[in-house]
Each structure stands twice: as C-alpha cells, then as structure tokens.
C-alpha cells in the first residue's frame, strides 16, 4: 500500500495529534515539547512530517537538514539529513508506514544519519542503514547509523 507523507503544519491541531503519541509512546520520542517551542517561537518552517489515515495522524518523524560545514560523517563532506523521533502508533506498526517515512527522507538524495531507539535496529538495517565507526568525541555516547546515497562513503576520522 502506498502512503502519502505530508509536511506537518506548526499549529494547535498538530499539537493535539502529537498528544496521542505521548499517550502511547515513549518519553524520549515525544515531540510535544519540540512542537510547543516552535509554536511559541512562531516558526513558519516545520521539521515535522507524518502520515494520516483518514483524519488521524498515525506516523511521524522530524527531519533536520545539517549544513555541510558540520558534516563529520560523509565523504565527500556535504549537507545531510538527520532523522529524529520516527514513530508509528502501536496499532499501525508493521504496515509499511515507517518504511514510507524513511523512503520519503531518501527522496532528498542526501545522506541520512539517525540514532536508533527502542529496539529499532532491525528496522533500520532493513532500510539500508549501517553503523559508522564510533568516535567518542563526535558521537557523544550515541550509536549513529547512516544511509549513503550513490557515490557517498563514510568519512574517515583522523587521529589528532
């Protein structure tokens, strides 16, 4: 089944939709605080994307574009996408919604970085993500994984 990924608006309706995820989800995946901050800052651009079934938001993620000057992961150095807080409501899991969100992120044709949470490593592996060589200074206790578009490889860290 094909799902349409929509760019979510920063408004109080989206805030109400996000409350369903907090009710069922894990605190570390909560986007309520992120959305509240964006509403109060009156931001126009939203990093939030989601999939609706009918009138209900059932899957969502945040996408942040990182500038080339901050790239410590990809060769050649370039701008990349960071996926945060991808979540599908429990009753809609294993129906291809998470895959649809990741495939949407890949359409930007930029490398993608994320840090898997809550027993999701198998999902990310199926989506073509691989672990990077851990660097204690760069990764700060995270275990990032990445997806490489054609022509991109892992940036090799140099010893200081």
Question: Which stretches of residues belong to each language-model region?
Answer:
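Conserved active-site alpha-helix within GNAT-family acetyltransferase domains
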Residues: 117-142
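Conserved acetyl-CoA-binding loop-helix of GNAT-fold acetyltransferases
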Residues: 88, 93-107
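Conserved GNAT acetyl-CoA-binding A-motif
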Residues: 102, 107-119
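Accessory recognition modules or surfaces
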Residues: 95-99, 142-150
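Conserved acyl-donor/pantetheine-binding loop and adjacent beta-alpha core of acyl/acetyltransferases
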Residues: 26-85, 93, 136-144
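Residue-level recognition of the GNAT/N-acetyltransferase active site
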Residues: 84, 89, 117
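Short amphipathic alpha-helix that is part of the acyltransferase structural core
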Residues: 1-39, 52
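Acidic, metal-coordinating catalytic segment for phosphate/diphosphate chemistry
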Residues: 158
């Amino acid at each position: 089944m094909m799902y349409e990924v929509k760019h979510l608006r920063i408004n109080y309706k989206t805030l109400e939709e996000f409350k369903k995820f907090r009710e069922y989800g894990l605190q570390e995946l909560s986007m309520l605080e992120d959305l509240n901050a964006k509403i109060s800052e009156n931001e126009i651009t939203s990093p939030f994307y989601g999939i609706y079934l009918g009138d209900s938001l059932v899957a969502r993620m945040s996408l942040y574009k990182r500038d080339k000057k901050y790239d410590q992961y990809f060769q050649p150095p370039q701008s990349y996408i960071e996926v945060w807080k991808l979540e599908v409501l429990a009753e809609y899991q294993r129906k291809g919604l998470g895959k649809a969100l990741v495939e949407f992120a890949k359409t930007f044709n930029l490398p993608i970085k994320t840090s898997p949470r809550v027993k999701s490593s198998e999902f990310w592996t199926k989506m073509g993500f691989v672990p990077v060589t851990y660097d204690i200074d760069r990764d700060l206790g995270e275990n990032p994984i990445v997806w490489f578009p054609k022509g991109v490889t892992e940036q090799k860290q140099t010893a200081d």
